Amino acid sequence: RGLTRQVSAALSQWGIIPDDSAGMPLHLSPPGRLLRQALGILGKGVSTPTLLALLKHPLAHSGGARNEHLLLTRDLELYLRAKAIPFPQSAGLQAWAQKQNNPMALSWAGWVSDICAAHWPADSAPFADLLSQHLTYAEAICRGSRPDEDDEAGGLWQQKAGRQARETVKALRAAAASAAAVLPFDYAGVFNGVLAQNEVRDRDAPHPKILIWGTLEARVQGSDLLILAGLNEGVWPQVPPPDPWLNRRLRHEAGLLLPERRIGLSAHDFQQAIAAGQVWLTRSVRNDEAQTIPARWVNRLTNLLNGLPENGGAQAFSAMRARGDAYLKRVESFESWQPAPAALRPAPAPPKAVRPQKLSVTEIKTLIRDPYAIYAKHVLGLAPLEPIEPVPDSRLRGVIYHALMEQFIKAWPDCAPVDRRRRFVEISEALLCAQVPWPSHQAFWRSRLRAMADWVIAEEERRQTRGQPLVLEGRGAVLLPELQFTLSAIVDRIDMSQGAELYLYDYKTGAVPTPDQQKVFDKQLYLLAAIAQQGGFETLQPGEVVEAAFIGLGAAKKYQAAPFDKEPLAQAWEKFKHLIASYQSEETGFQARRALFRVEDYSPYDQLSRCGEWSLSAPARHEVLK
């Protein structure tokens, strides 16, 4: 059956559906797939990938307003990707629907919420009840939020496959009356097994001249061209199944047939088939694991012909191979391609009017290391899609740690010294429960946070002696009037001493930039300090920043101050203005991967820049755009 599916998939390139004598397995038909998807959600709950796969099924919401359903599904997918929501909930879906400019959005979101909320009973239940709940749920999915009149199940039970599925379900429902109570897990196994045992054949849809036969059908039917496929040992003939109870001698004494009888029947089928008018003998040279071995009768035929040179056997065999090679070359021509010239390293130079006039502090590092990413994001307006299945990655860990430090610092004045660790643990636990719905990562991050609690408290006591927190997660911006450029930022924390001196901190859960990196590439602390000194942050008057530092919250707990002694803040600010002025000039191109930290570092726009077709040592192609 695997070879049949491969051949059918290849023929689908030309819109050809072969007439398969075995039909399509019912569980692989559209109704079968939807019933199994519904079964999976009832048993395991809904996640973003499973929900989107269900909503995009061709039978989902087939009862009416299918076009609006597909439009809303697309918008919902973009929302779930952007917000990195692993498990959609009713409240979030309703909040999203209220922001949509679509009169159908609210009712549609309610329908999706019902899909997400469905689940099996906790304990065992009568088989008939589980079957009724399953079918009612599947019909509601197909009916949709705005069904047509007298439409109870959309297209679920329509077409040949739908009618066959309905007959199978009727037979199962009749047998369910005498079944005992079962667990939902056992019901799922029975239902999937029943679907897999049934097949669907549509005599009208397939091509009338392309047929896929089994050995039984090939014995009694003829064709103009017969292709004998899968001629490898273990496929044709198949390996006899092992008998765990009787060996060959005992089987013979009991009067049972030996396993080798099946090989004899396969040889008989091959002998009949190869006598057709025109025959192709085909086999795969490799499978998933290693080289394959030709079937024994192919080897026998090869040896026989090559062993009869005086009778023209070798010439006949060579002619057979030549005719086969001619067809193989045709197949290879379908897949041939003309090599395209390798792209040059791009460095587009767009007009000044479309160049970015506002960047955030964190984007300045990208502008220095990979200017092409800034061009793609701000000039072309391209943003990479988030993965369809959110994962608890370093970005989420950073969000958790930043929120923890913000809430903990706010609660610091009201906590007695003996209660600080307890308060730290309470805040971390609330954040993990609310934003990390993966139990394994919850446990792992919980252990790391509790292990660092004493260090955080001790370091915080030291920092509180120098100044009091004045700004937490504060937004700010500063305008460069001579360049008409705005630099925006979000600062994690700014403290003020009694002498009105400012201490600026930024939390890092990953690697902390070294002083040399801060001088050249990572200018975050310098730029935050410059904005603070100019009074660019809300609720903060201009003041002198005497120290700006990264606080490492990762495995290596590190405190790294900006090297103001090696490069004064005023000097760094002048360099920044020169950088912005350079990229506002139409002579400067946004070069791809200009100075990434490591060669293997990934940029979300590598595919757009055709990275891999050019080397990092290659000169950039400066292209002035109009």
Spans of features found by a protein language model:
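Polyanion-engaging groove/track-forming segments
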Residues: 1-415, 429-435, 439-442, 601-610
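Short beta-strand or tight-loop elements
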Residues: 206-211, 266, 468-476, 485-491, ...
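Metal-dependent nuclease catalytic cores in nucleic-acid-processing enzymes
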Residues: 218, 261-280, 516-551, 580-584
